Amino acid sequence: MTIPRVLFITGKGGTGKSTVAAAIALALSRRRPTTLADLDRRMSAAAALGATPTDSTAVKVTETLDVIALTPRAELEAFIERIVPIRAISRRMLRSRTFGYVTAALPGLEAFLLLERLRIMAGDAALEDRYLVIDAPASGSAVELLSVSSGVKGIAPAGTLNRLADSIDSFLGDATRFGAVITTTPEDLAVREALETAATIRERLGVVTVAAIMNCVPDLLFDTSELASLSPLGGHARLAVRRNCAHENAALVAPRFADAGLSTINLPMMFTPAIGRHELEKLGRVLDAQLIGR
């Protein structure tokens, strides 16, 4: 499979989206230079890699991997500074009450300019032969983010914003430049949300989902007879049953993704209190074999 230049990682909250984004970025950086753009307010993906970006300046994690923090408000300010290059005037505009009224009258403008920044970064990545991995918001907010250009077109049917919206739509619909990776866990609610997200972004926006990542899949430790022998252990036996169920559920839901035209990749459960570089390396090896190198 050809990996698109930009991978947009999203999924239901609690499915390990940021961990997967960090692991994919680390795995890709073994092959060519990669940038991880962290859109999460908590900067979880950046933190897992040991980086603490504080603004729109990239922080180097390794020789081939850097991390950047992006926020909608910062992109709005950067846009104003580009079109009003005299800093004193642009700063005054951003602080003015009138400007606040204007942005309130254009819902989604900040998110729209964030998408435009990602499109520009994707173009730069193509020129520099690098990958861009985006730790996006959880799936509901991610769909809103990806859909924002249609709202801007409705408000601005002509002019600069409309032209930018056309460029963004073209970017999102180009499978060589942009693709989504959706995280899930073996639980039914997470699986349903992943399938709904993939269908929505495909039908509404033409966005291709590269793969569904089934995260936190434990190994099968006990067969049925062994589980029965554990019953005197009470709570420990219940944990063993729950672990087996999670493993079996991952196999049971795979056909649902296949029916939707999606391949699934299982990532093992990391039985650690926190995810760090060691765990990301382990997950990255699985992703390199099953997603990147296949």
Model regions and ranges:
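ATP-hydrolysis module of ASCE/P-loop NTPase motor domains
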Residues: 86-122
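Flexible beta-alpha connector loops of hexameric P-loop NTPases
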Residues: 73, 77, 101-108, 152-160
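Phosphate-binding P-loop
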Residues: 1-4
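Conserved catalytic-core segment of NTP-binding enzymes
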Residues: 15, 19-23, 30-31, 35, ...
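NTP-binding/hydrolysis catalytic cores, primarily Walker-type P-loop NTPases
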Residues: 260, 264-294
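P-loop (Walker A) phosphate-binding loop of NTP-binding proteins
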Residues: 12
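N-terminal phosphate/diphosphate-binding loop that engages ATP/GTP or pyrophosphate donors
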Residues: 26-94
